[in-house]
Regions:
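Conserved, non-catalytic sequence blocks in retroelement Pol enzymes and Pol-derived host proteins
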Residues: 27, 99-100, 157-161
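Short, compositionally biased low-complexity segments
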Residues: 2-16, 49-53, 80-86, 119, ...
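Active-site-proximal segment of RNA-dependent polymerases
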Residues: 80-142
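Non-catalytic, polymerase-adjacent accessory regions of viral genome-replication enzymes
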Residues: 1-36
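Conserved polymerase palm-domain catalytic core
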Residues: 41, 114, 118-204
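Conserved pre-motif C helix in the palm subdomain of viral-like polymerases
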Residues: 62-92, 137, 181-204
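Active-site-flanking structural segment that lines cofactor/substrate pockets
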Residues: 33-62
């Protein structure tokens, strides 16, 4: 069962970078009542993900971004606070995305060290292969990801809220925001998107 204190922890973690947003401000006006309601909804399995907003970013390439409501972001942080420490125990050291103490700068620094080592201090040729996964997020098979995460939680997570965490992970992963969202950008020509990376926006 999820308790108020752990939901409060997720709320405080969530608002660190979102406190100035309208959604965060509205939630904060009655945050105790709102957190109690959110906690009760999770425990009774009545929680449902709200409408996301969808907008287009143009740099470094055209892509759609879905942003959840503030209360849904609290749930995301609730999940992340439990899974991130476990992921850190199994991730390869060369995984740099979305990890504390890693990121782009750490990745570039490691790459420079690798090039220096492979080229024997820049005295020999060394080759670098740059690759990308086309339409990565759009092509994820949600059911397979949900099972992988559920198996991971069952094996590694030991908290009293294990069943709640399993339920929330499945709910969030299987959610399809493109079916219920508010558009915040004008339509964009399909040709501007990389192949496989459009779900909502297209000029009709």
């Amino acid at each position: 069962m999820v308790d108020f204190e752990t939901m409060l922890e997720a709320y405080l973690d969530c608002r660190k970078r979102k406190r100035s947003t309208v959604g965060a401000t509205e939630f904060e006006l009655n945050y105790v009542r709102n957190l109690v309601e959110l906690t009760n909804e999770v425990n009774s399995r009545q929680y449902r993900i709200g409408k996301s907003i969808c907008f287009v970013v143009r740099y470094p390439r055209y892509r759609e971004v879905f942003a959840g409501q503030f209360r849904d972001r609290i749930i995301h942080h609730y999940i992340a606070l439990r899974l991130e420490p476990l992921f850190e125990q199994v991730f390869c050291d060369r995984t740099y995305n979305c990890r504390k103490g890693k990121g782009q700068l750490a990745g570039v620094t490691q790459l420079a060290e690798d090039i220096r080592e492979e080229s024997e201090n820049y005295t020999q040729d060394a080759y670098v292969m740059k690759v990308d996964l086309k339409g990565f997020f759009m092509s994820i098979i949600k059911s397979e990801l949900a099972k992988m995460i559920d198996d991971f939680v069952v094996e590694y997570y030991e908290g009293d809220d294990k069943e709640d965490l399993r339920w929330l992970c499945n709910l969030v992963i299987m959610h399809r925001p493109e079916l219920y969202c508010e558009r915040r950008s004008p339509p964009v020509d399909v040709e501007l998107y990389p192949e496989g990376e459009i779900a909502v926006y297209q000029r009709r």
